[in-house]
Amino acid sequence: MIYNLYSIYDKDAKEFGPLFNAKNALIASRYVEQMLNEVKNVDPYAVYRMGEYDTEKGIIDSTVSFVGDCSELLKNHEEC
């Protein structure tokens, strides 16, 4: 099975947080909403797809791509 790997980037600290996996960007945004539920200002945070993890082959493809700023992702998620 292929899992997408994501991380939250802290623009102020200039570093990525721990990896988490999700089926797609929509599911990842739900996880982000839960993780940042207590944070008052989500503007300094963004979500990146860090790559894929193939559980059958044990291979990680580390192609990094920007998913979106947390403020926009959470706003779009609330509208769904």
Residue ranges with predicted function:
Residues 1-15:
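Short aromatic-glycine-(Arg/Gly/Cys) micro-motifs in beta-strand/loop hairpins
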Residues 23-34:
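Charged, amphipathic alpha-helical segments
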Residues 15-24:
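A short, exposed loop/beta-hairpin motif centered on an aromatic-Gly-Thr core
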Residues 11, 25, 52-53:
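Generic structural motif
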Residues 15-16, 29, 56:
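Eukaryotic short linear interaction motifs
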Residues 6-7, 32-38:
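Intrinsically disordered, low-complexity boundary segments flanking structured domains
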Residues 35-80:
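Short, mixed-charge low-complexity intrinsically disordered segments
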